Amino acid sequence: MLKETSVVIIVKNGAAHIEELLNSVIDFNEVVIYDNGSTDDTEALARNFSNVSWYSGNFLGFGPTKAHAVSLAKNDWILSLDADEIVSEALKNSLLASRMENRQAGLILRENHFLGRAIRYSGWGKDPLIRFFNRTSAQFNDAKVHEQVVPQQGVSIVQLSGVIKHYAVDDLSQFLEKVNRYSSIRAESGLKARHPILIILKTFFAFFRTYILKLGLLDGWRGLVISVSNANGVFWKYIKAYAKKKVKNS
């Protein structure tokens, strides 16, 4: 199965982890990298790997961009990764041994790392994602953020062994930029404007849900940062949508 699979990656300025990522998928015969305007050494580093096919194009939102990148692959079986994700040895072996059928899709656990440590709680514990699929029976949806692979009706889901190691956050400045960027994408993608009082309530609940209900407090100071950042993201996406509506109507 491994040799019949194309690894598909979208990237922008992914030099920090691209070599580790590509070494983790070096046994795959094709790695499609779809770049969205990198200005660092991502391309130079990636071209050192003989199985890499390099493409460049505009970022259309995560769902549409990943769907386009998938269309560039030679194989129908797809392993979709982000540029800050690493395939574990156990997962690679699981894919190597896999004899999945076209009407099946692979569910993979993602282990999220925040400033050098795996997060167990805060809603960031090992999250199951469909990342291995046949493009004839499953596709990415059109969501601009928080995109998902959507299997066609009747496709069965198979749990694969191993994990994807996700370097979610390497430094706090990067994290804040990501929160800001995601909130802008959500605000521009038809998010309904809310009254400021409701925005405040949603912001407080986002913190409470992450820190208390999802046990972020057990992740120590990292859990606190994640909880505050989640609340911050909720506040900014709604206030940006609200401001956009007010300016438009003024």
Give the role of each language-model region.
Residues A15-A16, S24, D35-A44, D82:
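A conserved acidic beta->alpha catalytic loop
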Residues V8-D27:
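Short, well-formed alpha-helical segments that are part of the catalytic scaffolds
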Residues P64-V70, W77, L81, S88-K248:
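Catalytic-site signature of metal-activated, phosphate-bearing donor transferases
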Residues K12, G37, L60:
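Catalytic phosphate/metal-binding cores of nucleic-acid and nucleotide-processing enzymes, i.e., regions
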